[in-house]
Amino acid sequence: MLIVVSPAKTLDYETPLPTSAFTQPDFISDSAELIKACRTLTPVDIAKLMKVSDKIASLNAVRFEEWSTTFTQENARPALFAFKGDVYTGLDANSLSESEIEYAQTNLRMLSGLYGLLKPLDLMQPYRLEMGTKLENGRGSNLYQFWGSLITNKLNQELEAQGSETLVNLASNEYFKSVKPKELKADIVTPVFKDCKNGQYKIISFYAKKARGLMARFIIQNKISNVEELKSFDSDGYYFVEAESTATTLVFKREEQNK
């Protein structure tokens, strides 16, 4: 079973790491090509393109300039411990055991606008480049055109290597659009998380993101190997709703959270 998640905008390069192990990303030369395109942008261009503040734009102009094709523990850190958004709050990677980190290294992948696809222990230099960014590049006018079938082909290799025919999609729509379902040699299962608010169950972004991380953690800790076992997910009060689920979409609900 292979899991894909989105990356995060918030990064952490300060917290002590729970492991000294690391690996290298698979698409460094492709990332370098994107960096080359990014270096043509001024901070003003970046602010407009990414819809970010001047401060964040300036920070990322510096990051693009300092980015190197040599990844070391001095200029990078394993991706799983560098991302700090809502998904990663739920995943809580720093509390995983060594054997759980090893399992994640085989079964968890992070989609990325700059790096394409990252393994948990892949060294990652800090960046901001969301998959939906309309960045002109040598392969097209956006990152979906840039990555083409590369990410899907890599996922197929990973699935074949572990003898799995199931991909669990815990990524956002923006990121999963970088995967080509028709070319993927696996069944795609997408968990959906709905929270009750004012008597209605709906997808609430903040809760849904955290729930995706909780589900990834649940799979890693329990070494889940089939879809049936996913249905027993019950972290933070979520429960499986058979009547609203299909073979490809698993619906989980949760009662209203006290404020």
From Swiss-Prot:
One annotated GO biological process: response to hydroperoxide
Pfam families registered for this protein in UniProt: H2O2_YaaD
Protein name per the record: UPF0246 protein VF_2109
Any GO CC annotation of this UniProt entry: cytosol
HAMAP family: UPF0246
UniProt xrefs under InterPro entries: YaaA
Family per record: Belongs to the UPF0246 family.
